[in-house]
Structure formats: C-alpha cells, structure tokens
Amino acid sequence: SGLIGQALLARLEARGDRVRRMVRRPVIDQSEIRWDPDKGHLDPAALVGADAVVHLAGTGIAERRWTRSQKDRILESRTRGTRLLAQSLSEVFPVGGPRVLVSGSAIGFYGDRGDEPLTESSEPGTGFLAG
C-alpha cells in the first residue's frame, strides 16, 4: 500500500503478472490475503502456488521522534512480519510454495550524508537504521 508497493504492483500487473496483496484488514476479494504480523496470523496455504513474495513493510521512519519505544516499534514492524513470512514459507515450500522472498525496508543504510552522492559501493552509515 506504500509508494514502492503501489509502483511495483502497477508494473507487475501491466506486465501481465497475477498479483495478490497481503492486507491487515478484512479481504475484499480473491486478490487479497489476510495477515496480521502483530498477532502472528497468516495461513501458509494462501501462499501455495505463488512464485514469489515481496515484503515491503514497516512503520514509517519519519512519522515520530525516535524515542526508545519508537525505535523498538520500527524494528519490530520490520522483523515480526519477515519472521512470520519466513516461517510460513518454510511450511509450504515442499508443497508448491514460493521459492523467493524479497524483503525491503527503510532507506537508512547509508546514514545521513548531506549532499554526498551515494551509490551501491558507498560505505554503510552509522546509527540506528544503518546498523
């Protein structure tokens, strides 16, 4: 539902791929899979037949001050869902589950470098999101 997810969804559908979205709210049709990473809920059977899972989730990093509790929320919002997906995928892998999991979150790997141009070969930053 985020910026990257919506762009990826549009691109995949334009290419002719069938995409099912994972949502936390009640599903509206067969194009959606209900899950709740906070409660550890995901029916692994819903993943059977998929080629891949793309996980682009996490609490926004610019929404609040980075208090200790907000940092914990940011970290948990990324790790909890990924753990649930990895567990569910391991259950369905032998019976036709996805063989690929792509997971991405945050944009802080390089840290705040001001106006310095950053590339894939740039050194990692320091600090909370860079570690």
Regions found by a protein language model. Give the residues of each.
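A general structural motif
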Residues: 16, 50, 96-98
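Conserved glycine-rich Rossmann-like NAD(P)H-binding loop of the short-chain dehydrogenase/reductase
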Residues: 17-24
